Amino acid sequence: QYDANNNLIQNTNRSNEWVKYADDCMNRQVKETNQLNHATEYEYDLAGNQTAVIDGNKNKTVYTYDGLNRLVSKTNAEGGMFEYRYDSFGNTAGTTMYGGGDEKATTTYAYDAAGNLLTETSPLGSVTTYTHDKEGHVLTQVDENGKQTAYTYDKLYRMVSRKDADGTATFAYDKAGNMTSAKDGNGTVAFAFDALSRTTAVTNEDGTTTAYTYDAASNRLSITYPDGKAVTTAYDSLGNVKSQTDHDGTGITYTRDAEGRTIKEGHSDGSTTEYDYNAAGLLTLQKEVTKSNSTRRQTAYTYDDAGNIVSENRSGVDIDKKDELVRYYYDKANQLIRTNIEGKNTKYSYDLAGNLLSDGTNTYTYDLQNRLTSKTGKDGTTTYTYDAAGNLIKKAAPDGATEYTYTAQNKLKTGKTEDGQSSTYTYNALNARIKNVQVRDNKNAGHANSDLKDGSHGTDYLDFLMDGRFFWQRTWET
């Protein structure tokens, strides 16, 4: 529904759930109220910039702007504050995040006359530098550790090579602009496409292929893995997943409401999981039902006016006869500060940047870049050390230390413990992990994988799939 000024004043979905909107005299939305009477309010300055958002719990986030209507600060209801600075051309010159007391973390940026980013300086002073071609494409990047990566492009400005200290990766494309291959010293990943540029096959470095099929709406119907097994998916007329069968023959079916929300899942063993929602679309009940139609367990949820879960009532009805009530409490920034489980309280605290400082069991510290530097609990303190690029290079725990190294692209390369256990990782040209070699060379079984014996080594081979997942297999020998 719209008012005389064509402002939206009510939106009602197919389930007859509605949200109402109110506008000021300048046709700016100032209030949004759902069917449960949970409201969010908005404030503006004379230029039309949004200066505040007030959530359903009356917690206010405030925004300020400069004379050019650029955001210069954001402050949440707990006092956590971010500031933004700009250069004379309007580029972001710096951001500052304020912590406790006088502590603040500032990141600065410098640009060339064309507006290309030249340097980025972290709060701890480490610098990343860039060079560009005349069209603005990055030619070189030197990270905080001094590692350089160089890029080249074709006439259509597609990256065709990437060179770093670990070698050169090359990339090829078809006439439609789809990447058909990515090659480096570890082999080639090849991609095949249909006339609609949908990926139909991915062939990995080891020659194995994963194949994909689609329906007329371009929904993916099947994935056939290198071992010949497939995962198949069916869809309804709206494109929602209706059923899926896994490679081992197990499957799941989905029943949905008019809004596309799952209200029932059917499992291969005959059991089901049912879901209910409130008028705001939030989950209010999850119920697990056995094949014989007995309720195994159910969980009911309630929410505050800002949409935070305030209670979780877990009950085992017929089989798992255990009831448990969990209550949740939040601060003005909607951060969880206390849980109560059957009368037992756990408290949480945060710094102004939102980092967890304590959780009732452990305390935590962070550096200016919000990286965890220590965790202290009843067993002692674990410390974390990072290189200039932010990679974790050492974890020192009370029971021993683990050290890590990285590739030129800052991907984890090795991890080694004090007692001689190690893992070495290999990546393809797309920086996807394709191999993990694990080694144990002494009698200490402290952190070993359960299927690796003393004095043995194991290898995980991971084939890259086009959706970012992997087909995995393991070999090991003594």
Question: Which role fits each region the language model picked out?
Answer:
Residues 1-13, 17-34, 38-55, 59-76, ...:
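Beta-strand elements of repeat-based all-beta scaffolds
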Residues 461-463:
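Short Gly/aromatic-enriched secondary-structure transition segments
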Residues 466:
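Carboxylate/His-rich catalytic cores and anion/metal-binding grooves
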